[in-house]
Amino acid sequence: MKKIFALLLMVVMSVTLLAGCGSDPVYDDLENFLNVEMKEVNADYTKITEEVGKWETLEDDTAIKKSIDDTLLPLVNGSLEKLKDITPETEEVKAIKDKYVKVMETYKTGFEALSEGCETQDEATINEGSQKLEEAVELLDEYNKALEELAKEHGSEVEY
């Protein structure tokens, strides 16, 4: 009877231990980050790219400044506020989030400089803003690569 009880106890303990081994906190945190917490931020980014896409049809710097001041900067600032409320549980996902915050901060700096340049007609300020926007795109590429690598390391994938 003792042998049967000991065997049964070992089986129960083994099942319990194996069930605990299947959990990956980074995977869970990343899935939550991408599919829940970043949902609104990603929607804002889509609106940002759509608004910038309209610039080709705008006739003058005043219209571009209005686009920046009335639409783009509020979207970027809103994204930065939403990002403040996101608190990943793992260091790996925190690092990914920090990369995205840097992207948005760089967009903000670029849009602010472009807005000022449109108002003052200062070519140097416009160039500075354009360079910052190019830097933001490069940072976004780095964010996406880091995100894809982390997802791959933890058995997930990123869909765009």
Positions of predicted regions on the chain:
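Positively charged n-region of N-terminal signal peptides that target proteins for export
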Residues: 1-4
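Alpha-helical segments in soluble extracytoplasmic regions
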Residues: 29-104, 109-111, 116-158
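Bacterial signal peptide processing site
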Residues: 22-24
